[in-house]
């Protein structure tokens, strides 16, 4: 049995360590008080929101994590840029913002033209899918600090104030809709790598694909689907299911969720069969659901019809009055 903390990623320890940084960061809000770009303290969750009159500028930052180690191990770099862009633009969507632009940060041990070209191809494809411009970035060559490379980015989006989605409108009875993920996306890779690679090797064949192909499958970009949803349906909440798995739903509301998740398939089944506890699976991985939308019950069918034109989507369940997340078909509560 292996947990995320045992694999080296202790979320509780990280949260405790971050408290001082978060406290000081919030203290800087006063430096923009009464000025253009004043932070909207009570609104941002997946992305911070800054006041620009009739609209908010949304901003978020994220990286690819240890997925880059798999790319390095097999020498395939042309999808990792898609992952980085996906991690950022999908977060912007969760406050109702349309992603607009991104700057990247690439830290390397030494420059390599082939690696850079592959990363650039992925960044271009990710930008194309998201409909954004890459307007700048930083490349840091640090042989004394970096072994390999790290890729991260910061993205901005815009949203009219009246269209901001915060989760405050969520009420018991609302429908919870899941949009299918492409696989593991960019979270839980440390656990997956340490559990599977030593035992099987990256070329291990599982259900018609090599292990490295399962691990490197690009994170799905939901921009077109979600923007169309927002335009046509009343959306009460949006959650990008990333680090923390289904616990991300708690970021939206104090109400609870009663849901049924899809069957455990693909890479998730392989991980589960190798000893990760069921509750830990739902706390770490997206488990086949990359994005969740919460909509009024009466708009559920229209939302499903619209989303299924882009990606396979399905009703997961409903919002309930009791706090917590109940995964009914697996008998667990988070």
Curated annotation (Swiss-Prot):
Which keywords label this protein? ATP-binding, Cytoplasm, Ligase, Nucleotide-binding, Purine biosynthesis
The answer to keyword Cytoplasm applying to this record is yes
CDD domains assigned to the protein according to its UniProt record, in alphabetical order: PurM
Any single GO CC term annotated in Swiss-Prot or TrEMBL for this entry: cytosol
What pathway is this protein a component of?
Answer: Purine metabolism; IMP biosynthesis via de novo pathway; 5-amino-1-(5-phospho-D-ribosyl)imidazole from N(2)-formyl-N(1)-(5-phospho-D-ribosyl)glycinamide: step 2/2
Which Pfam family, an example, fits this chain?
AIRS
Show the catalytic activity.
2-formamido-N(1)-(5-O-phospho-beta-D-ribosyl)acetamidine + ATP = 5-amino-1-(5-phospho-beta-D-ribosyl)imidazole + ADP + phosphate + H(+)
What biological-process terms (Gene Ontology) are attached? Answer: 'de novo' IMP biosynthetic process; adenine biosynthetic process; purine nucleotide biosynthetic process
Q: Could you tell me the EC number(s) of this protein?
A: 6.3.3.1
Q: Which GO terms describe its molecular function?
A: ATP binding; phosphoribosylamine-glycine ligase activity; phosphoribosylformylglycinamidine cyclo-ligase activity
Q: Where in the cell is it found?
A: Cytoplasm
Superkingdom classification of source: Archaea
Instruction: Kindly report the protein's main subcellular placement as a broad class.
Output: cytoplasm
Record's InterPro entries? PurM-like_C_dom, PurM-like_C_sf, PurM-like_N, PurM-like_N_sf, PurM_cligase
Similarity comment: family membership? Belongs to the AIR synthase family.
State the protein's name: Phosphoribosylformylglycinamidine cyclo-ligase
- Species source reads Thermococcus kodakarensis (strain ATCC BAA-918 / JCM 12380 / KOD1)
The gene designation is purM
């Amino acid at each position: 049995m292996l947990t995320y903390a045992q694999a080296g990623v202790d979320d509780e320890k990280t949260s405790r360590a971050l408290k001082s940084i978060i406290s000081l960061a919030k203290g800087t809000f006063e430096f923009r008080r009464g000025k253009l770009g004043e932070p909207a303290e009570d609104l941002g969750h997946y992305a911070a929101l800054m006041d620009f009159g009739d609209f908010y500028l949304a901003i978020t930052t994220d990286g690819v994590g240890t997925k880059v180690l798999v790319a390095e191990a097999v020498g395939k770099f042309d999808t990792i840029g898609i992952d980085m862009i996906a991690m950022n633009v999908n977060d912007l969507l969760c406050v109702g913002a349309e992603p607009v632009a991104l700057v990247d940060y690439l830290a390397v041990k030494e420059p390599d033209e082939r690696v850079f070209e592959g990363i650039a191809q992925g960044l271009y494809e990710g930008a194309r899918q998201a409909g954004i411009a890459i307007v700048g970035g930083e490349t840091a060559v640090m042989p004394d600090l970096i072994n390999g490379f790290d890729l991260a980015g910061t993205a901005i989006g815009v949203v009219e104030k009246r269209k901001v989605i915060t989760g405050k409108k969520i009420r018991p009875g609302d429908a919870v809709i899941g949009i299918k993920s492409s696989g593991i996306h960019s979270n839980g890779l440390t656990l997956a790598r340490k559990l599977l690679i030593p035992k099987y090797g990256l070329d291990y064949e599982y259900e018609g694909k090599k292990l490295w192909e399962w691990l490197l499958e690009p994170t799905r970009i939901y921009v077109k689907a979600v923007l169309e949803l927002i335009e046509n349906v009343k959306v009460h909440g949006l959650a990008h299911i990333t680090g923390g798995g289904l616990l991300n739903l708690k970021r939206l509301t104090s109400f609870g969720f009663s849901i049924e998740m899809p069957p455990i398939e693909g890479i998730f089944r392989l991980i589960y069969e190798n000893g990760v506890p069921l509750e830990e699976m739902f706390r770490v991985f997206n488990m086949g659901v990359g994005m969740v939308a919460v909509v009024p019950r009466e708009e559920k069918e229209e939302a499903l019809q619209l989303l299924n034109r882009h990606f396979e989507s399905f009703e997961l369940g409903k919002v309930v009055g009791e706090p917590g997340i109940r995964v009914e078909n697996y008998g667990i509560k988070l």
